Amino acid sequence: MSSLWTENIEMPEFPTLEKDIRTQVLIIGGGMAGVLCAYFLQQAGVDYCLLEKDRICQGVTGHTTAKITAQHGLIYEKSLQSMGQERAELFLKANLRAVENYKNLGRFLDCDMEETDSYLYSVRERRKLESEIQALGSLGFQADYTEDTELPFEVEGAIRFPRQAQFQPLKFAAGISKNLRIYEHSEVREMTEYFALTEKGSVAAEKIIIATHFPFINTRGSYYLKLYQNRSYVLACAYGKNLKGMYLEADNIGLSLRNYEDYLLIGGGGHRSGKEKNNWDLLRDIAKAVSYTHLRAHETRSN
């Protein structure tokens, strides 16, 4: 399924693996995570290769809202409670450092990288926002609490993370992957601890990174028995309101909003596949209420 990101973008093409090779690190999976692993390994002078069963960055990466932020919901109070002070601080710092790394890379790529603030808002749960602010403060991060947003509806409040970013993910991926050692249309059929077999070749590696959307091999935990498919949606609304920032709802259906060119992107409506109740119609109603003209839609899947 096409998306706003896949239009008018020509991704680099890579050969199929048709021989037996050896390398220090094998990466399996060519989404954003796998491509970035390959990039940083190359920067560090490590011998590597990446195997992708189809084309790179055509899954979630090509159908995302494409926000770069350390805000992923009300997570830091929970992290503090479950991890303790030291680990929660490291978790927050790692997220913030990743945002800066993305921005630094984006400065050298034609990927519509834009620094902007990110807001986590709630229409009814002020107390939860206040608790999250307190947790962030105890972790050494000064986030702002505000009741003044650019949203076209009233909110109880919002937590602002300054200097986050948004971008065009496929432009970013196209630019960063051009000189990487990647093999496309090279699905891994069999695998051991240090070896991967494809239809036409094989890779022997000292280390293997599995960067697929879900673990495609049976590892400890038997995750293949526990996985189920979730679906969520992103609507691209032409000539929608300019929000001057990125927004994520802390409750209800996890509404996500950001602008790109003349579009307002509205994401959310997540639900378990196969369930009678889903939030697609609700998401469309919200989109019609906050945008001015026609809608375009695509669907994302997660497990």
Regions found by a protein language model. Give the residues of each.
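Extreme N-terminal leader/targeting segments of oxidoreductases
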Residues: 1-23
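N-terminal Rossmann-like FAD-binding beta1-loop-alpha1 element of flavoenzymes
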Residues: 25-49
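Glycine-rich FAD pyrophosphate-binding loop
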Residues: 44-63
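Dinucleotide-binding Rossmann-like beta1-alpha1 core, especially the glycine-rich loop
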Residues: 71-147
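Helix-loop-beta segment of a Rossmann-like dinucleotide-binding subdomain
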Residues: 110-120, 146-173, 269
